[in-house]
């Protein structure tokens, strides 16, 4: 943790005046004492260190809220505690005084308003006849006409968050999830009007999603306690179908006859397996094997198939930097044949049963049978793969003759009878009405309703969402956001004991500040203080809906400039760039640009630089815009020439790149080229790239310094550790080369040292722990924080 030090310039010595594991910060020197705040007693208080006696005393004794933002004018200290401002005069010896501050305000930021919410859509569900949609937007549920009619806000609850609205297949009700009671519950709204009905009561955790049974009698939901729960839509009675100790359930769907459900469940080997469950007998049966990851199961509307995706295509991609491989794009679309007498829909036509049911018209859905028959014995062996290239798929709908699915950002259809694949729409998602006649597309913030498409569709007129207007009352909304955040941690934090924190007491402590929140920034601050009590990493506060000012990017030249006495600007230094990266482009260092250090910039776009107080006023808005510079080797317009450059928006990457290059040179020089150096900026793609960029060319070094200081984190540190741990167990040689190779490839067997500091964060914090735990080498520097907790959905 931070300590406070005294530096003596004359003696060139330093003295640590705190030297403990607590956080000691913000020193203020007044007279013979140095005041600072410290959490050595768990709550941040004001302390004073006497420079004469060397003794430290505690000045304040707050036990509930931390002291925040102390500052001094050299005589008086002011600080904030629990939302109030206090003044402390060290000379008087009196207790800190609360300063009563009254600010007159019209409270314009937190006024009630009626807000258009068409840009905040989070979900939608089409009615069975496709004449209307239930649209969820910014915590409200709207009943919206597909073409013409009245848009109705059926919730109007600024103090609650409604979501996942779903129209019942019989068209009589809209179900949705609401936290208006303080917990997430399932609610029902009769489409003819009237008051909504709370269907579930006394729920004890976060409900993930809801799903109607095709007969409209039941509603399924999954929750954060890894349960599948079925609710009777009439009585509200509910039963827990199952609970999985190993993880949550995903993609739970009913069969057409409402007797079965299918879902994905993670196994002990972390492979997702698809199951069917008989709601009548209470028995569960596997659809897929544990050998392959499978997901997204849906029943075909005729009840003959379950369509799903599975990762079974093993197509290795070999690396160029080392002899290694990776598997990606392994997915395919599969069909499970539920009845053992059902033939594969992809059999050649001559091999099919010649007795066929009358064909439905192209625009008619296949009629569902009254009973879905599943022969559970041998079900995992009755799988058929659609002849599609490997990809990232998710099935949408099937009528038993065709399969509509998503691949990346496109919707496609595979005709099981013709064996043909058709692109339906790009840049869109699709859902299908309960009767299988209509499709709803969501694309670029707009909703479109069409007939169930059999060919490529041109999305024409979108559903008019402009009348979706929600009442916003921040005095109700902000406490709801606070409460939902508290519940999210209560239900989702990785340890049920909340790191030993009394989470109910913490809620009460910070909820007391909510009446004083007048902006979203205030709310975010309060939430941040609340979750900080858990002392864990990755506990973020998203800013929410706040007003921001668009920054006009400044054009920068990748150079250090100074003003000459003539009024022109001298180029003191051109920062070198790297040709392999556009983000490391240095405008004045690019080949062919006729300019050098020591030259002068006498005009920008024809405007003399002598006519401005600051040269950068001529570069406002010039980032990534072609700009004309007039330059000369002397501070004069006479003899000057013009060049065209493209200024950059940020010079930090250039400075960072050159800092790394200088470190490499320092290590090279200090070790006579025997030791390599790698700086890893983060544990994401950039950090992985930088490691690879400098690791493989330095495999000839005898030792290696890895620099993890100020690492921004990510998740790739295990990949780095794996490479650093490699030891050769076999050697290779060639008659025509003096080089000796190793198996495994790309090994550096010499000593390794890791540099760290307190800014090494997230996976950049885990990396030094792993480095030390695996015995890779010494770790040098100030300790990292060590409060790493991972992220999950």
What are these regions (language model features)?
Residues 57-71, 285-296, 393-394, 423-431:
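Conserved blade-ending motifs and adjacent loop-strand segments that build the rim/top face
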Residues 459-534, 538-540, 563, 567-569, ...:
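Terminal targeting/pro-maturation regions of precursor/exported proteins
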Residues 1-5, 9-11, 16-25, 35-47, ...:
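A flexible loop/linker signature enriched in serine peptidases of the S9 family
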Residues 105-121, 372-389:
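A short helix->beta-strand "capping" segment at the edge of beta-propeller domains
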């Amino acid at each position: 943790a931070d300590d406070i030090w005294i530096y003596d310039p004359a003696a060139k010595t330093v003295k640590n005046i705190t030297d403990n594991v607590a956080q000691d910060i913000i020193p203020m020197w007044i007279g013979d004492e140095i005041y600072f705040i410290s959490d050595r007693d768990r709550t941040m208080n004001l302390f004073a260190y006497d420079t004469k006696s060397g003794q430290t005393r505690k000045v304040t004794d707050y036990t509930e809220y931390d002291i925040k933002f102390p500052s001094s004018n050299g005589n008086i200290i002011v600080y904030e505690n629990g939302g109030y401002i206090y003044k402390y005069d060290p000379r008087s010896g009196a207790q800190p005084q609360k300063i009563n501050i009254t600010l007159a305000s019209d409270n314009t930021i937190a006024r009630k308003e009626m807000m258009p919410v068409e840009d905040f859509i989070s979900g939608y569900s089409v009615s069975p006849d496709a004449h209307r949609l239930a649209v969820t937007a910014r915590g409200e549920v709207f009943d919206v006409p597909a073409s013409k009619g009245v848009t109705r806000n059926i919730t109007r609850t600024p103090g609650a968050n409604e979501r996942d609205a779903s129209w019942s297949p019989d068209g009589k009700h809209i179900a949705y999830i609401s936290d208006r009671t303080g917990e997430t519950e399932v609610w029902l709204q009769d489409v003819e009007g009237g008051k909504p009905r709370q269907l579930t009561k006394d729920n004890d955790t976060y409900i993930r999603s809801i799903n109607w049974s095709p007969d409209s009698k039941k509603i399924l939901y999954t929750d954060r306690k890894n349960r599948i729960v079925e609710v009777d839509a009439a009585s509200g009675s509910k039963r827990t179908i199952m609970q999985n100790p190993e993880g949550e359930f995903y993609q739970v769907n009913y069969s057409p006859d409402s007797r079965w459900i299918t879902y994905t469940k993670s196994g002990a080997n972390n492979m997702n397996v698809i199951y069917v469950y008989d709601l009548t007998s209470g028995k569960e049966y596997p659809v897929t094997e544990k050998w392959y990851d499978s997901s997204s199961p849906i029943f075909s509307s005729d009840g003959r198939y379950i369509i799903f995706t599975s990762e079974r295509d093993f197509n290795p991609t070999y690396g160029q930097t080392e002899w290694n491989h990776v598997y990606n794009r392994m997915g395919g679309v599969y069909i499970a044949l539920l009845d053992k007498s059902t033939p594969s829909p992809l059999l050649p036509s001559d091999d099919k049963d010649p007795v066929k049911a009358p064909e439905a018209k192209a625009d008619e859905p296949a009629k569902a049978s009254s009973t879905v028959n599943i022969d559970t014995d041998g079900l995992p062996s009755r799988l058929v793969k659609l002849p599609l290239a490997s990809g990232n798929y998710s099935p949408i709908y099937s009528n038993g003759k065709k399969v509509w699915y998503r691949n990346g950002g496109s919707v496609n259809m595979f005709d099981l009878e013709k064996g043909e694949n058709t692109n339906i729409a790009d840049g869109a998602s699709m859902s299908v009405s309960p009767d299988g006649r209509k499709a709803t597309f969501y694309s670029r913030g707009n909703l479109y309703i069409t007939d169930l498409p059999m060919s490529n569709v041109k999305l024409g007129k979108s559903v008019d969402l402009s009348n979706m207007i929600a009442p916003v009352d921040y005095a109700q909304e902000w406490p709801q956001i606070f409460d939902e955040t508290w519940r999210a941690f209560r239900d989702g934090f990785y340890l049920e004991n909340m790191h030993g924190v009394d989470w109910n007491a913490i809620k009460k402590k910070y909820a007391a500040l909510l009446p004083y929140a007048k902006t979203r920034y205030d709310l975010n601050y309060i939430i941040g203080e609340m979750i900080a009590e858990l002392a864990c990493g990755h506990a973020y506060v998203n800013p929410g809906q706040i007003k921001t000012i668009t920054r006009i990017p400044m054009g920068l030249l990748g150079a250090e400039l100074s003003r000459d006495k003539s009024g022109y600007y001298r180029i003191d230094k051109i920062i070198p760039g790297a040709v392999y990266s556009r983000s490391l482009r240095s405008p004045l260092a690019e080949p062919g640009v006729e300019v050098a250090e020591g030259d002068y910039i006498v005009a920008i776009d024809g405007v003399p630089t002598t006519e401005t107080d600051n040269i950068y006023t001529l570069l406002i808005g010039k980032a990534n815009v072609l700009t004309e510079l007039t330059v000369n080797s002397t501070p004069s317009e006479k003899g000057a020439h013009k060049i065209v450059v493209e200024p950059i928006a940020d010079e930090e990457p250039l400075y960072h790149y050159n800092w790394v290059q200088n470190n490499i040179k320092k290590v090279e020089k200090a070790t006579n080229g025997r030791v390599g150096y790698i700086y890893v900026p983060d544990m994401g793609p950039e950090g992985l790239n930088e490691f690879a960029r400098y690791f493989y060319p330095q495999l000839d070094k005898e030792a290696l310094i890895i620099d993890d200081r100020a690492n921004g984190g990510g998740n790739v540190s295990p990949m780095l550790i794996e490479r650093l741990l490699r030891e050769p167990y076999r050697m290779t040689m060639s008659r025509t080369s003096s080089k000796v190779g190793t198996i495994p490839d790309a090994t550096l067997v010499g000593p390794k040292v890791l540099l760290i500091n307190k800014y090494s964060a997230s996976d950049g914090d885990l990396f030094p722990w792993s480095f030390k735990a695996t015995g890779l080498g010494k770790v040098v520097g100030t300790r990292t924080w060590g409060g790493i907790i991972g992220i999950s959905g």
